[in-house]
Every structure is written in C-alpha cells, then in structure tokens.
C-alpha cells in the first residue's frame, strides 16, 4: 500500500515535483554562473536588475538608457557595425514595457502635446521621400530615429502625467539623469585629453594633448553632446540661484539639501564645460556661445534687462580678448570659423594642408546643393545623401563623409524645400513652446526651460557645420522634448493659480 501511494505520487501528483524542479533549475543556473568570469557575472546581474526595475518603473529603464546610449559608436567599432547597440535594445524594451503597461491598465492613450502635429508632419514628409530613393533601407533607419524621439517624448509625458502630484519629481529625475549622462562622458573626455598620455595621432592639439571624444569616437559629436548637458545645467543652476535669491529672507530648514543640489549641478557644469573645451570642436564652441547668449538674454523676465545683461557680457568678453585673457589657441581656432562658413565653387582650387579641411567641407556643401538643384521639392530621399553622393561628387573628393557637414544643406538635398520647411516648422514650434514657458514658469522650474532654450540654440548653431542626429543623441533630445511638455503642464498650473489669486 505504501509502495503504491509512493508510486502514485511520483507518477500522477506532479504538483509535488514542482518545488524540486525549481531547486534543480536554480542549482543548474548557479553552476553555470560560477563558471562565468567575474566581469560577465557582474554584467549579467546588473542587466537582470535593470530589466526587473524597468518592469516595475519604465522611467528607470529610460534613465539607464540615457547613460549607456553614448556607448553605441564604441560598441559598433568593437562588434563590427551592429544594427542595435545596448542603448537601443534597452530603449526598445522600455518602450515595450510602457506600451504593455498601458494595455494591461486599459489606458493606451497618446498624450496631447504641442509637438504631436510637428512630429507627425516630419515623419510623413520624410517617409514620403523614401520610395524611389537610392537606398530606402538607409533612409528608413534615419526615419526610425524620429519615430523613436516622438515615442520617447510621449512616454515621458505619459509617465509624468500618470501621477500629477509627482510630476515635479519626474522632471527633476529626468534632468538629473541627463546631467549624469553628460558627466559620465565628460570624465572619459577629460581622461582622453590629458591624463591618458596617448591617442589618435590626428587628434593631437597644442603639441601634447589629444582632442576629447568620449565613446563617440569623434570630437565634434562629442562636443555637441557636451553642450546638451552643459547648457541644460547652466539653466538649472541659474534657476536654483534665482529661486534662492527671491526667497533669501525666508527661513529654511533644508539649506543643506539645497547646497547639495547646487553643488551637484555646478559639478556637472564644470565637468561638461571641460569636456566641451577639450573636444576642441569649433562648431560645439560656437553652439555653446550662442546657447549661453540666449540663456543670458532670457534670464531676466523682462527682456530689456536681458539685452543689457547680454551687452555687458559681450563687452566683458571683448575686454578679455583685448587683454589676452582668453588663450590665443582658442581665439585663433574660433577666428578661423568664418572661413568654414563661406560658400563658393571649389573646383580647381589648389589644395594644401592649410585649406584641406575647409575645401573638403565646401566640396560636400557643393555636392548637397547639386542634389537640391536636381531634386528641388522632395530631394534624393531622407538619409540618402551618402548613397547619392557619387553622382554629385567633385573630382578631388570622391569619398562621402556620411553627411554634408551642414545639416540644413544635408536636409535640403535629402527632402527638398518642402521637407526643410517642415523641419523648420518643427523647431519653430519647439522654440515657441519653450518661450511660452519662460513667461509663466516659477523659479526654479523656469531654469529648466532656460536651459532647454539654450540647448535648442546651441544644437541649431552647431548643425551649421555638422550633423548631430548620431550615436543616440536623439534619445536625449526625445527626453528633453518630453520635459518641455511637462514644464508646460507646470506653467499652466502656475498660470491658473495666478489667475485665481487675481480673482
């Protein structure tokens, strides 16, 4: 009887076996993990933790994505040009979790924002140019970047509006992660510039230093990325200091936390500022100068004071140049920028070491203008500058550089006048929305909007000589677009409060 019951349990009552099955599975997994190298084991544990935390809070997955997204170029170099890097994989997983959460809660909604229509127009016009292009698959990859930016913006807005009472916390969290991403790259860049002791020979500057490039593998996009964090950090820092000044007469029990917050933002600004300088990128420097000028101008709520403040700043900077306070190596590099912006036919121009980079850039601008001339309205196809380049290349410049080194000419060549107009409309909407928030937001949240205005300006100016929708920079832009919409919610709430007070 006992033997029969034992056999029945083993054969028929399988539920009794389940705990033992899990134990055996755990033992096998443990044995496999023991055989892994320590570095691989730690990486696996970290990845598992990120996956679990993302399932609980998608915002955590997005935050980690911001940190690892700049690794894309380095991963592609090591792994040989993969389609999806770790940042892209985590982003796709985070978006999938966000959508799945909405479906499970039966609240799959598209948040209303002022950028929904501009994003839709950009997506439609760029997609329209792909059929018949030389390489639709390449154009589709560029198109997916814009789709990702739109989805990231919507996710940030949705997560921020999910619990309105925690909206400010979402804004602070996103700003912190954006600054932390900048710090992580700045530290690498500082090490590359003067602490490592070697580097690519063509990156040598000042005889013994090397241009910083982070994990971007190129100094110019690295400098552009530094601007995203630096200009945002400057705006946030001014916001915190202005809020303190307005409330200095009040007694606060949290000055310690406030000082810690200011210290953290100041550290981020200093490190990313050094990273920007060490990139030795003229385009990034001029983008920073333009972004800083806009931040100074809009810092006071009344623009006449902003104009006076900006004028004073320019005068002081001019005095610094006159007194040679600014290093001559920096001023000399900036002064040569005007040469890079001139137009002209470079066919037949003598090429030498002194003018090589300038002529190369102008040759690619000329090729872009040729594409635009032959395809006025819809261009050669979104993302198809490089595939179409051979037909328009000048004799001495057969190799495409991937883009025209002027994103506006690049876009004109790829999507024509219509596409460039839509792109301009998109950014006009971004600037307009940001300017609106500067009118109504209270400090220190106004500082975030101030930083974003600087970011948009620096980004736009830098793209006069480069293309910055590379190496997952657009992921950070998507989060910033989401921040802008959440700031608009804060501004609307503040406006209603003022109106109620007036009533």
Predicted regions and their residues:
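N-terminal hydrophobic segments of proteins, predominantly signal-anchor/transmembrane helices
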Residues: 52-147, 447
